[in-house]
Regions:
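Long amphipathic alpha-helical repeat/alpha-solenoid cores
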Residues: 1-300
């Protein structure tokens, strides 16, 4: 395949069991992978990064072949199929019928929640790309969680929004844990059921966090002087750990920004998002904006 010596060495260090594969198994496996990833350079990169996904038992080859054919029948992009094989090899080692059940459930849920059939393939590709492990989850868990959220008053359009935003991780939730999380959040924010649903739609990840994590984060924010109304306006701040919140508050305060009286949007987001917001704020402080309507000085 043209792999270099260092690449082969890395593969053997990470997955020494590769030496147990005989040439016939290697040839069969290579043919399977080339059917979805014909670019040899890309395939070598995948093998180096996910050696255990490539060097699998010959007993799995029939299941792998059937699963590849199934996903190709869905007209999924080859890159998506390759990513699934590399990131979640267990889903290709098992009988194809198990993947069919989960995919059918996802597609049915998408359509029942008002999704357009024309866009279903794109939606499914995006979901599988973001969370390849969704195929290994229980289809019944997905149905039960959607039913629970429907009973909490979420409309079909809102449920589709949550299913898309949660990237299939809704299968990892449980009605009891979600119920505890929602009850605690409603108590802390003293909001109505309708207001709570709006908060969840702004911050779907809120459904993930158990009570003890939310308790720590609420206490951290309130202890730093952030008000409940600010949290309601920008609930995604609850996705940040207390340590990250305190660090960002200190950096903002160093440049004269008081988050207790301003918007929490600048505090929010990933590290990259924050650095960009922080950089813009610092520039505004260090370089006063030009006022285009101020009278110009004239000289006689």
């Amino acid at each position: 395949m043209g792999a270099s010596g260092p690449v082969i060495a890395n593969v053997l260090v990470d997955h020494p069991e590769a030496v147990l594969c005989n040439p016939e198994e290697m040839t069969a496996q290579r043919e399977l992978w080339v059917s979805v990833c014909p670019n040899k350079k890309e395939l070598i990169g995948i093998i180096e990064k996910f050696p255990a996904s490539f060097f699998t038992s010959a007993s799995h080859h029939n299941n792998q072949r059937n699963n590849i054919a199934y996903f190709q029948s869905l007209n999924l992009n080859k890159r998506i199929i390759t990513k699934l094989m590399a990131s979640a090899p267990q889903s290709f080692s098992r009988p194809v019928e198990q993947n069919q059940v989960m995919v059918d459930t996802l597609q049915r849920s998408y359509l029942e929640l008002g999704g357009e059939k024309l866009n279903m393939k794109i939606w499914l590709q995006k979901l599988l790309s973001q969370n390849p492990f969704v195929l290994l989850k229980s289809a019944e868990a997905l149905r039960q969680n959607l039913l629970f959220l429907r009973d909490r008053g979420f409309t079909t359009a809102e449920l589709l929004h949550l299913l898309s935003k949660l990237r299939g991780f809704v299968t990892e939730l449980h009605p009891d844990s979600m119920n505890q999380t929602l009850q605690y959040s409603q108590e802390m924010m003293a909001c109505s059921g309708d207001e709570l649903r709006e908060i969840v739609l702004k911050c779907p990840a809120l459904l993930y966090y158990p009570k003890h994590i939310l308790t720590e984060r609420f206490e951290g924010l309130l202890g730093a002087g952030i008000s409940v109304s600010q949290i309601i306006d920008t609930p995604t701040v609850l996705e940040l750990t207390t340590q990250i919140v305190n660090y960002r508050l200190q950096k903002l305060a160093a440049h004269g920004y008081d988050a207790r009286t301003g918007s929490l949007d600048v505090l929010n987001g990933t590290k990259k998002d924050f650095e960009q917001s922080y950089g813009k704020l610092r520039l505004r402080v260090e370089r006063p904006l030009f006022n285009p309507v101020a009278p110009l000085k004239t000289y006689d």
